[in-house]
Amino acid sequence: MAAAVVQMSMGYRGLLAVRNRGTGPLALGVVSSQLRAFSVRKEPELDENPYYGKYRDKIQQLRRTNPSAFDARLDKRKELKQQPLGYSKQAEFAKTVEEKVGTASGKGFSKNKTLDSILNIELIKDKDADEIREIWKQYFSLRNSVYAVIPGESFELIWRRAKTCPSFLYALPRKEGYEFFVGQWSGSELHFTALINIQTAGDAAPSQLILYHYPEFQKDKGIVLMTSEIDTKFLNVQDAQCLANQVQLFYGSDGAETFGLVEKFNHKSDEFKYMAVVSFLEQSGLGKSFLNEQGHNKEDKLE
């Protein structure tokens, strides 16, 4: 798709808007020169950012509870702008961040969410893969969660790649553009944190989504169980599903181009082009499908 950049919020790196100008798709992994020309030269005031209101409570909580830390992190914003977009300290705080700040829901994410805290493993260990899959589906089908039963071989590829490339930048389509999230693997958990949170709160930025993977049945049954916890003040189930689908796209696809982008983000950040993430998302159809689903959900609510 030929595209032109629509300048929003004076070039803020956490939000990018793209307007279609034609019907032809971009080649897979190719970003037009217009997209590369996207300007980030002027930094907006924090409260001018279109997503600031969404995270205001978290930021204000940090300001109230630890004002010196808040001021110090604001001072670092200029330094952060000079670093490659691929740079992130997520690996250092993904496991501890919820303990420091907690989530907006008030109860925080679960700590040490093991498989036996969800299901009685002893009761299902003798069942076959199809039976376990059906039990998992029935358990989560009425819950506000994203869940899956992943083929063992597929997860093995994702897991092997996650060990060498534990973080990546994901784009969540919005009506006005894209909201970016950094995903960071911590063991078999995958934490997602909004880029604007990282830029403003640093290592105190809380996650908005965690995907939990359970490989207990991978060897014997050939399946890996997955579920999630969502901070529903910031993300809905459709948002979380879109991010989870992108994990399969970038970590689980056979194509070298998609995982090559993940490798650049982790090991060659100076070569990483964040608009290539949008290009792959549009080429795969995930972005369009997500926006269509969001539109249908809004129509259903109006009826």
Curated annotation (Swiss-Prot):
For this chain, one GO molecular function annotation is: protein-containing complex stabilizing activity
Q: Which UniProt keywords apply?
A: Membrane, Mitochondrion, Mitochondrion inner membrane, Transit peptide
What Pfam families does the record tag this protein with? ATP11
Q: How does it sit in the membrane?
A: Peripheral membrane protein
Q: Report the SS bond pairs.
A: none
The places in or outside the cell where this protein is found are:
Mitochondrion inner membrane
- Keyword ATP-binding assigned: no
Transit peptide feature, positions: 1-46
Against InterPro entries, the record matches this protein to: ATP11
Q: Which GO terms describe its cellular component?
A: mitochondrial inner membrane
Superkingdom = Eukaryota
Q: Does the keyword Mitochondrion apply?
A: yes
Q: What is its main location?
A: mitochondrion
Instruction: Name the residues that span the membrane.
Output: none
Ranges in a coiled coil: none
An example GO BP is:
mitochondrial proton-transporting ATP synthase complex assembly
User: How does it associate, per the subunit comment?
Assistant: Interacts with ATP5F1B; involved in the assembly of the F1 component of the mitochondrial ATP synthase (ATPase).
The record's function comment reads: Has a complex stabilizing activity in the assembly of the mitochondrial F1-F0 complex.
Q: Can you tell me which family this protein belongs to?
A: Belongs to the ATP11 family.
Q: Which PANTHER family does the entry link to?
A: ATP SYNTHASE MITOCHONDRIAL F1 COMPLEX ASSEMBLY FACTOR 1 (PTHR13126:SF0), CHAPERONE ATP11 (PTHR13126)
What name does this protein carry? ATP synthase mitochondrial F1 complex assembly factor 1
Query: What is the originating organism of this protein?
Result: Xenopus tropicalis (Western clawed frog)
The protein's gene is named: atpaf1
